[in-house]
From Swiss-Prot:
This is Fructose-bisphosphate aldolase, chloroplastic. Plays a key role in glycolysis and gluconeogenesis. Its main location: plastid. It comes from Oryza sativa subsp. japonica. The keyword Transit peptide applies. GO terms for biological process: fructose 1,6-bisphosphate metabolic process; gluconeogenesis; glycolytic process. Expressed in leaf mesophyll cells. It comes from the Eukaryota. It catalyses: beta-D-fructose 1,6-bisphosphate = D-glyceraldehyde 3-phosphate + dihydroxyacetone phosphate.
């Protein structure tokens, strides 16, 4: 990627927010090398981000690894075979009218290159539905040495060449998920590692034509209250945007996938949708620049109904960003159970998927009501130490 280098004398912050409480020396003028992105894809990135962040639509996250997909299939008594994964993914992407509610679909690498059971490329099916294909590009979590039993996300090695190939295959956005655990700290090291990795990924993605979805998931695990989640989330997003700026990421060409600000899953004090909305919107206003086109929330183990109610509460007034959803289990859970691996249940399962997609579409517009929701849709899906 071509870039231009300018020499400029200026005062620059030398520390991110984590170091803000330390005694700072008086700033001195320094001569620094400023790198200006010469982005060949900039206009396309902005257009793609705006397409995904369109009114009444959100993202279907169907990028579970083959191992995680195997767990989902096992829950309905199916073996984890490529044929079964193909059958389930075919069910999802061929749901009639899905594009009315879904603007983007995050795929696992196998899915990006996969065809439906009828032999048509899944990417082509999505495009016909006016759904932008995306791709999970991280390589999963591994232990972070020197931390309090925390993790970091791998996958930067070879990312540029992989993303160039994904672009040629039809992907137009990418997703990188890292996690922060409140019961384990989080340590300064873990937060910095998460933020830096996300920033490098975002810069590399934009250089290769893919809109990066930035996802530092704050896990639900723990007994902490909502105020503690809010405190940690402020630090995580401050670090993330600090390092994205350092890496010359164009904010108009990214999307965010944050956790909602909620109490820990094991906290005795539960939060109402209005409380979740108040805390989450306060976080966004404090930390997220209005240049960012879309905030696509993850559900993180909330029940299908809870995730929809919380999103609806956040859309009761105007926001400077498109506030929407990027759900996996909160869109698919009832659909998967309805299907049960039986061909005769495909239509009923697709209807269940469309029902949830429509509910969240209405929530994005602030028009959702929970009247008539099934009891099963209200069951929480939190799994302690969940591995995606």
């Amino acid at each position: 990627m071509a870039s231009a280098t300018l020499l400029k004398s200026s005062f620059l912050p030398k520390k991110s927010e984590w170091g803000a409480t330390r005694q700072a020396a008086a700033p001195k003028p320094v001569t620094v090398s400023m790198v200006v992105r010469a982005g060949a894809y900039d206009d396309e990135l902005v257009k793609t981000a705006k397409t995904i962040a369109s009114p009444g639509r959100g993202i279907l996250a169907m990028d579970e690894s083959n191992a995680t997909c195997g767990k989902r299939l096992a829950s309905i008594g199916l073996e984890n075979t490529e044929a079964n994964r193909q059958a389930y993914r075919t069910l999802l992407v061929t749901a009639p009218g899905l594009g009315q509610y879904i603007s983007g679909a995050i795929l696992f690498e196998e899915t990006l290159y996969q065809s439906t059971v009828d032999g048509k490329k899944i990417v082509d099916i999505l495009t016909e539905q006016k759904i932008v294909p995306g791709i999970k590009v991280d390589k999963g979590l591994v232990p972070l040495a020197g931390s309090n039993n925390e993790s970091w996300c791998q996958g930067l090695d070879g990312l540029a060449s992989r993303e160039a190939a994904y672009y040629q295959q039809g992907a137009r956005f990418a997703k990188w998920r890292t996690v922060v655990s409140i019961p384990n700290g989080p340590s300064e090291l873990a937060v910095k590692e998460a933020a830096w990795g996300l920033a490098r990924y975002a810069a590399i993605s934009q250089d290769n034509g893919l809109v990066p979805i930035v996802e530092p998931e704050i896990l639900l695990d723990g007994e902490h209250g909502i105020d503690r989640t809010f405190e940690v989330a402020q630090k995580v997003w401050a670090e993330t945007f600090f390092y994205m700026a350092e890496n010359n990421v164009m904010f108009e060409g990214i999307l965010l996938k944050p956790s909602m600000v909620t109490p820990g899953a094991e906290c005795k004090d539960r939060a109402t949708p209005e409380q979740v909305s108040d805390y989450t919107l306060k976080l966004l206003h404090r930390r997220i620049p209005p240049a960012v086109p879309g905030i696509m929330f993850l559900s993180g183990g909330q029940s299908e109904v809870e995730a929809t109610q919380n999103l609806n509460a956040m859309n009761q007034g105007p926001n400077p960003w498109h506030v929407s959803f990027s759900y996996a289990r909160a869109l698919q859970n009832t659909c998967l159970k309805t299907w049960g691996g039986q061909p005769e249940n495909v239509k009923a399962a697709q209807d269940a998927l469309l029902l949830r997609a429509k509910a969240n579409s209405l929530a994005q517009l602030g028009k959702y009501t929970s009247d008539g929701e099934a009891a099963e849709a209200k069951e929480g899906m939190f799994v302690k130490n969940y591995v995606y």
